Amino acid sequence: MAALWLQSVSLLVLMLVSWSGSQAVLPPQHLCGAHLVDALYLVCGERGFFYTPKRDVDPLLGFLPAKSGGAAAGGENEVAEFAFKDQMEMMVKRGIVEQCCHKPCNIFDLQNYCN
């Protein structure tokens, strides 16, 4: 409960300082889950915002057929499952969760997601 109060107060201070035109720079903050959504509501106001959290795929894995064979099992014409994993990770576009939860962000980063 205290963490929620502290997070809300720090976000409110961040917003008040930035809206007042002050030149004071507050450090960026990590905002995740409900805190991130609340921050977007406060920053974007009536304009609204674009936020689509990724769906958890673990429950869906039970519906997929199990792989049989493969390069490890002697499939000569099959490519290793994770051969291009590094290249694919570099191509993933950073979303608001990556920008504000995994890394700290500021109010200007949040404003980029307003409609």
From Swiss-Prot:
Pfam families: Insulin. Residues 1-22 form the signal peptide. Residues 56-92 form a propeptide. It comes from the Eukaryota. InterPro entries: Insulin (IPR004825), Insulin-like (IPR016179), Insulin-like_sf (IPR036438), Insulin_CS (IPR022353), Insulin_family (IPR022352). Keywords: Carbohydrate metabolism, Cleavage on pair of basic residues, Disulfide bond, Glucose metabolism, Hormone, Secreted, Signal. GO terms for biological process: glucose metabolic process. Belongs to the insulin family. Insulin decreases blood glucose concentration. It increases cell permeability to monosaccharides, amino acids and fatty acids. It accelerates glycolysis, the pentose phosphate cycle, and glycogen synthesis in liver. Heterodimer of a B chain and an A chain linked by two disulfide bonds. This is Insulin. The lineage of its organism: Eukaryota, Metazoa, Chordata, Craniata, Vertebrata.
